[in-house]
Amino acid sequence: MSAYSRRYTDGPSNYGQDVRGRSEKKVEASHTTKWSGTPSRHKKIGKEDFDTIVTGHLTQEQMDAYQQYFRIEEISDILRMASESQSEVLSLLPSGNIANNPNYEREPSPPPKYDAAGNRSNTREARTKLALEKERHYLVEVAAGSIKNYMSPIDYRKPVKTYEKIYIPVKDYPDINFVGLLLGPRGNTLRQLQEDSGARLAIRGKGSVKDGKSTSSNNDDDDSNSSLSFSNPNLNSSGNDDLHVVITSDSQSKIAKAIKLTNQVIEKAISSPVGQNDLKRGQLRELAILNGTLRETKPYNPETQQSRRSRPGLDVSQLVCKSCGKVGHFARDCKFRGTSDGNNNPIVQDQADSYQQTAPYSDSRRQREEEDPRNNGREEILPPWKKKKPNVPLPPWQKPQQPLPSTDAPPPPVGLAPPPSSLAPPPPPPSSLAPPPPPPPSSLAPPPPPSSDIAPPPPSSDRAPPPPPSGIAPPPPPSGIAPPPPKSPNGVAPPPPPANDAPPAPSSTKNPPPPPPA
C-alpha cells in the first residue's frame, strides 16, 4: 500500500434522514477505487520497510522529502517486478484486477492510435507505464534538488528529453491571434521564450500551419516514446490534436519556467483590451524596424517649437552671387563660374556689387570668409584641368628657326627717301659752323686709320689709358666732334657749351678720308 493510499470505511451515515426536504436515498456504504486495498502499518519495498504512518515531529519540507522518496521507490519496484516477471504493469496494480474488484469503474479510453505496422500504440498498458515513468522522472528531479546527497534508483535512467503540452484556448477566444503573439516578428518572441526558459517550444495542432501547406505525418512518433516523441516536429498525434504548445527539455525546472512564460503571453492576450497590448505593440515596432518602415514621431513640445520659430533663419532672397549677379545662391555654387556669363561680364559684376552694397547680408559664415585677411587676394579655386598653364620657356628644339640676315639691302618703300649710301661721301657741314683747324705740320706721316673690323676697347674709368709710343703723334680727332673741354685746376667742370640747333652729320660706316697733306 502506498503512502497516498486512501480507504473508504463504513461509518455513521445520515442518508436515511430527511435533510431540508430532500427525499431519502440509499447508496452503498463503500466505493471501490483504484487506490483500494488492505491497509498496513509498514510497506516492504525490496529489502527495506517503509512506514505508512508518520508518528514523529517533522517539518513540511521533511514530510515532502519522505513522500517523494517513498513514491520513487514504489514506482521503481513496480516497474522492476513487471520487467523481471515479464508481466504487465496493470496486473501489479489494484486497478488491473477487475475480477477481484467487480465494482471498480475505469476511466474511459482515448481514441485508438496505430503505428506503421498496424498495431495499437496507446493501449491501457502503454499509457499506464508511460504515466508511471513520467511521474518518476519528475519526482527524481525534485528529490535531487531538495534532498542532500540523494541517489536515484539503480535501474533508473534519465530520459534524453521530457515534454509537456499547453493547450491554447482558441475555441473560447477565436478573435485573438495566439499563434502570432507566441511567434512574434520572424519568430523572435518564441526564440526569446526559449532563451529565457532554456526549453524548446513548438506550436502544434490544428491551425499551427497555414492553409494550403501540408505536413508529412509519421506514425512512428507518438506519445508512447518519451525520448523520441517530439524530436520530429511532424507528429501524427499533433496534426489531429487541438492547437497546443509542446515544451521539450531535459529538466523539469526548465519546463516549468517555459510553462509560466507561455501562460503569461496567453493571459496578457486575453486580458488586455484592444489596442492596449504592450506585447503586440512592441512586436509591431520590432517588425517595422526589421522592414525599415519605422517612423519616429516625437510628442509636441511647445517650448521647443517656440524657440525654433524665434530663431533667425537664412533669407535666401538676400543672397547675391558675385559670379553671375543672380539672387538665391552663393558664388561657390554658381553654375556660370568662370564662364562668359559670370566673372567676364563687367555689367553683371557691377550690378552684383551694387546690389550687394544695398542688400543686407545675413549669412554669418559668408561674412567671416570675406572678413578673413587670408582670403584677400586669393584667386578663385579651380580644378587642375581648368587652370591656365604657366609661361614656361620652350626647349631649344621646339623654338621656331629665325631667318639668316641677308647682305642685300631691301628696296626702299615707295614715297620715302632712300637711306644714305654707305659709299657716298658725307655732306658738307653747314655754313654756321666753322671748320676745324688743320693739324700742325709734322715730318712724320700720319698713322694708318684703324680697321673697321676690330673695334677699340671701351675706355675704363678705373685705369688710365696707356701712353702713346714715343716719336708718334697722336691721331687727330674725328671730324664733326668737338674736343673735350679742359679740366679746371680746381676740379670743377666748366659749364657746357650752348646747344646747337643744327643736327649732327650722319656718320659713315666706312673709314673717313684722310686729311689733305700739309
From Swiss-Prot:
Q: What InterPro entries does this protein's entry cite?
A: BBP-like, KH_1_KHDC4/BBP-like, KH_dom, KH_dom_type_1_sf, SF1-HH, SF1-HH_sf, Znf_CCHC, Znf_CCHC_sf
Q: Which SMART domains match?
A: KH, ZnF_C2HC
Please state the protein's primary subcellular location: nucleus
Mark out the compositionally biased spans (Low complexity): 225-240
- Extract one GO BP annotation from the record: regulation of mRNA splicing, via spliceosome
Q: Which domain of life is it from?
A: Eukaryota
Task: Specify residue ranges for compositional bias: Pro residues.
Answer: 408-518
Region of interest called Disordered, as start-end residue ranges on this chain: 1-47, 94-124, 202-241, 295-314, 337-518
* Polar residues: bias regions: 340-361
Q: What does this protein do?
A: Necessary for the splicing of pre-mRNA. Has a role in the recognition of the branch site (5'-UACUAAC-3'), the pyrimidine tract and the 3'-splice site at the 3'-end of introns.
SUPFAM superfamilies associated with the record = Eukaryotic type KH-domain (KH-domain type I), Retrovirus zinc finger-like domains
Which positions fall inside the KH domain? 167-233
The UniProt regions of compositional bias labelled Basic and acidic residues, in chain numbering, are 19-31, 363-381
Q: Where are the zinc fingers (CCHC-type)?
A: 319-336
Name of the coding gene: BBP
What Gene3D superfamilies does UniProt report for this protein, alphabetically? 6.10.140.1790, K Homology domain, type 1, Zinc finger, CCHC-type
Keywords on this record?
Metal-binding, mRNA processing, mRNA splicing, Nucleus, RNA-binding, Spliceosome, Zinc, Zinc-finger
Q: Where in the cell is it found?
A: Nucleus
A GO term for molecular function: zinc ion binding
In its UniProt entry, the species of origin is given as Debaryomyces hansenii (strain ATCC 36239 / CBS 767 / BCRC 21394 / JCM 1990 / NBRC 0083 / IGC 2968) (Yeast)
UniProt lists the family membership as follows: Belongs to the BBP/SF1 family.
Could you identify this protein by its name? Branchpoint-bridging protein
Which CDD domains does this entry report, sorted A to Z?
KH-I_BBP
